Amino acid sequence: MSSTKRQIPLLALAIVLLLACARFQVAQTPTLFSKPSEPTAQSLFEDANGYLGRKYQEFNKQNLPYDPKLEQRTKQEQLNLARQNAATLQARKKLKGDDLYYLGLLFHLANNGDAALSSMLQFLKEHDEGSKAQAARTLVVVYGTKTNNLAAAEGAVKDYRAHQPQTAEDLYNIEFLLADAYQRSNEYDKVVEHAEKILEAAKSFANANRTDTFKRDDMLLKSAIMLSNGYVKTEQKPKAVQMFADLRRLSVALPSGSLYKQTTIRLKTLDPNFDTQKLFEDVSALPKTTLPDIVAAQWIDQHPVKLADLRGQVVLIDFWASWCGPCRYTFPKLVEWNRNYKDKGLMILGVTKYYGHADTRPLTPGEELVYLREFKKRNQLPYGFVVGDSNVNELNYGVLSIPTTFLIDRQGKVRFISTGSGEEEIAELGAMVKKLIEEPVSPMSASESSEKN
């Protein structure tokens, strides 16, 4: 039953990982003729927590097709087991230490938030260090914000920040829960206080996680939206505009076409008169960019190149697909720019990938490659194609929609991102191509020369 796999909720996954780090074993000395020992609190939790995994393995061995009713029934069985094991553990006298911790986790599995909160608060009275304490604090925030016990949630966040281990993702999650709770109660000064910390955590996550681009962009955008709402509600709209402008600048540095598009939309909504081109006018203000190389399974009418090899040229990277109507709308301009500027240093790379179909027909990679060659010839596209066999290029450049175009100057800096094929977008892109071509060629620095070599 392979299709029954489901994503673990983010916070639950963090707790599972913290448990893995904090796992311990208690040595026991067997006694001759002793009674069977009762299951430990940890084993009771692991029995319930691992129930779904065990059942899904059984279903896979039986080659059962996905059945939503079976999935629902299996989840209910896990819930019942968690309740049963929690009752077994709770019936024991004078629980303390890790017993309280695992009891809290069992109540969490059993969807008993009040009991989970109570157990974790008792556990934290005795234990304030280590992975288990940090996991307990995340649950206190979850159920504190659900039950409007914001004092407990605030205290747990403060204590989480004061102890280790901690992660940017956990900080993002618990601060977000608090900000959201204050937003529901219209306490917008508190929303701003915690949303600023959410954005800080999202940026820390972005710095440390260069590969999980979609999660990175989602965290950055959601935190910015939360903070923007707080600023607007507290009559600090200029701060909201500046915050999105800064995030838009970050989207160029990452780079991320999706984040760039979303921040541009938000800026225009907040301030219709905002000059979205100003970011690209001051070259010295642009962040240093380390661009990922384009990963290719095949090159069409273009020898393999690395971006570092193209320093000294203006590079236009166009993400497109043969089935994309708006992408085709840009072809005449791409052909025109190639004709006008190729000899002046413009290189265009059309980046696509194998989609497994074309013109409503399923195609093998070999057949699709033949189709792309014929498509290129039929549409008289004079620039090279880059064909990927995975989503790696889209992930690296944060591309969620096409066409998306990145324009890179002769020093290797992203100077413009275009996300769409409207007349305004195409006109702006064309103006930037002309501007970069006409910029004087700067001597290559020693560091740039060594990087290229």
What kind of feature is each model-predicted range?
Residues 24-98:
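N-terminal leader/linker segments that initiate helical-solenoid repeat arrays
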Residues 68-85, 108-119, 145-158, 188-204:
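Helix-turn-helix repeat elements of alpha-solenoid scaffolds
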Residues 88-98, 110, 124-135, 147, ...:
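Short solvent-exposed coil/turn linkers within tandem alpha-helical repeat scaffolds
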Residues 107, 143-144, 182, 224, ...:
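Residue at a conserved register position within TPR or TPR-like alpha-solenoid repeats
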Residues 174, 329-379, 386-395, 431:
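Structural microenvironment flanking redox-active thiols in thiol-disulfide oxidoreductases
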Residues 249-297, 308-311, 441-453:
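N-proximal helix/coil linker or "cap" segments that precede and/or mark the start of modular domains
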Residues 304-328, 334, 348-349:
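Short active-site neighborhood of thiol/selenol oxidoreductases, capturing the structured segment around
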Residues 377-383, 387-434:
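Thiol/disulfide oxidoreductase modules built on the thioredoxin-like
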